């Protein structure tokens, strides 16, 4: 889901070769295929087994640099932070039996109730400085009602009610903001039973948990356990912590300068993505990583709705704009 960034990164390397620029620092292109599966066979493999090939002061990665409209104003979020993961399995035990005789301790029913509680709950709110700055910056450049509503989302006593109202009118915006304010857990897979007329003795579900930077695995699991109840056994499948990088760097300044030239009037703003990228792996080598895969968008395209959707796509003109923008950043920074 980031073939545009792969192409732009490769093209930047090709352009550096074609133009014969004199490099003042190494320029490394790394392409791997398993970020969606946890990065174990890709970025983590490179970091752990071949660190000399990918050791760098800075990394430019996916998710950032796309146009975000608030009214008539344009913003360009630059990813400086991302959540960690906790992929886990929920298991509920029950008494097996014949399907013709319903049981109150049916493991499938009990798991369903636990999943419903998890799906309906909002875990506790934890405001991060990068998220506070992001929402306040958007508010300052937005018309009413966003100008008033966005800062109120930082106050837990108002946030839940406002998000529920926002979900009825702008669902994608609501779920995106909600995921920036708290740890989240989305059930994605279920498994129970082998035969239609047999009540199984156990039922399982897999859940995609995302943890805010600064929150521990133990804190997250405690939040989830309080919601699903003590009868649910939780087993962690995979986990890594979230990351946050300093935006006060020469590379970040270069990105802002180029964006100002490529789209005067647009406002760069650091932000946190609710997902994760390979940046968490490269951070283990001390790299400062930014999500910057620029794409210029029109006001009618909901870009984040494309992620993992039925029709993932980007506009061709926006891609061409992004290719030139990324090259300008790379060229200016490495020469």
Residue positions per predicted region:
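Acidic-enriched catalytic cores of C-N bond-cleaving enzymes acting on peptides and small amides
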Residues: 51-58, 64-73, 78-87, 99-190, ...
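Active-site-adjacent substrate-binding region
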Residues: 115-124, 140, 145-147, 161, ...
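Zn-dependent metallopeptidase/amidohydrolase metal-coordination segment
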Residues: 241, 265-334
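Short, conserved micro-motifs enriched in small and acidic residues
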Residues: 1-7, 36, 105, 313-320
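A structural signal for short, well-ordered beta-strand segments
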Residues: 29, 90-92, 207
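Short glycine/serine- and small hydrophobic-enriched flexible loop segments
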Residues: 11-18, 113-117, 328-331
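Acidic/histidine-rich catalytic neighborhood of metal-dependent amide-processing enzymes
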Residues: 2-77
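C-terminal substrate/ligand-recognition segments
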Residues: 192-227, 240, 244-259, 268
């Amino acid at each position: 889901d980031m073939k545009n960034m792969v192409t732009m990164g490769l093209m930047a390397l090709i352009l550096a070769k074609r133009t014969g620029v004199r490099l003042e620092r190494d320029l490394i292109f790394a392409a791997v295929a398993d970020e969606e599966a946890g990065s174990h066979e890709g970025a983590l493999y490179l970091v752990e087994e071949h660190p000399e090939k990918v050791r760098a002061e800075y990394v430019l990665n996916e998710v950032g640099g796309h146009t975000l409209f608030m009214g008539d104003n344009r913003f360009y979020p630059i990813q400086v932070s991302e959540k960690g993961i906790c992929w886990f399995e929920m298991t509920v035990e029950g008494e097996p039996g014949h399907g013709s005789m319903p049981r109150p301790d049916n493991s499938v029913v009990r798991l369903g109730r636990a999943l419903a509680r998890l799906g309906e709950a909002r875990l506790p709110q934890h405001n991060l400085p990068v998220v506070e700055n992001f929402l306040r910056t958007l508010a300052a450049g937005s018309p009413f009602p966003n100008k008033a509503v966005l800062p109120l989302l930082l106050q837990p006593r108002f946030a839940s009610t406002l998000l529920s109202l926002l979900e009825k009118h702008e669902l994608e915006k609501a779920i995106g903001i909600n995921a920036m304010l708290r740890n989240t857990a989305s059930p994605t897979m279920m498994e129970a039973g082998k035969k239609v007329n047999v009540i199984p003795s156990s039922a399982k579900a897999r859940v995609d948990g995302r943890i805010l930077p600064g929150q521990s695995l133990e804190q997250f699991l405690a939040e989830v356990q309080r919601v699903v109840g003590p009868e649910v056994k939780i087993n962690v499948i995979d986990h890594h912590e979230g990351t946050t990088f300093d935006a006060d760097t020469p590379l970040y300044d270069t990105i802002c300068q180029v964006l100002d030239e490529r789209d005067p009037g647009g406002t760069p703003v650091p932000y946190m993505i609710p997902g994760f990228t390979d940046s968490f792996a490269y951070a283990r080598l001390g790299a400062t990583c930014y999500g910057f895969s620029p794409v210029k968008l029109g006001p009618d395209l909901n870009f984040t709705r494309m992620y993992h959707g039925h029709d993932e796509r980007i506009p061709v003109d926006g891609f061409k704009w992004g290719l030139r923008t990324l090259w300008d950043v790379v060229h200016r920074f490495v020469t």
